[in-house]
Amino acid sequence: VRDGLTFLDVIARQVLALRAQYAAPLPVIFMNSFRTHEETEAILAAYPDLPVRGLPLGFLQSAEPKLRVDDLSPVDWPANPELEWCPPGHGDVYLSLARTGLLDALRGMGIRYAFLSNADNLGATCDPDIAAWLLREQVPYLAEVCTRTVNDRKGGHLARRRSDGRIVLRDNAMVVPGEEP
């Protein structure tokens, strides 16, 4: 990112600063794909005070088979079977938290809310005032959104669900051709 630091270095330093400022454990856990997990662990090893007792610094999201565009059959790559798989995307965080037992571990520690952000969004940081508001108002979910620009072709977007009119976060993979935002 800058001065020899990675996104992970900056995040680790942000978390450690917040812990010091508020005298709170503030766990940080990274969801990785099978392709990024080892590199993430190697970078975070430089921060021995980062792990919170009883919680891992990272967990693996699921993997799903790559599909051919022409017939949607699984890709076959005998020379390197790892290339037959891909990470499913950000929406897998909820399923992977449950599948790995991490959701139960967090609940068992009394943790009720989670702050989720892409690692490359360094402007997003855990804000204690927002956490206090969530608790005080008993808000179950909060998302920070911004107006999309022409550069925001990737990623999810807000949509109104037809079945009940609720606003939902819709991943691009869920968009019917012709209904792109």
Regions found by a protein language model. Give the residues of each.
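Domain-scale recognition of functional cores that engage charged ligands
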Residues: V1-P181
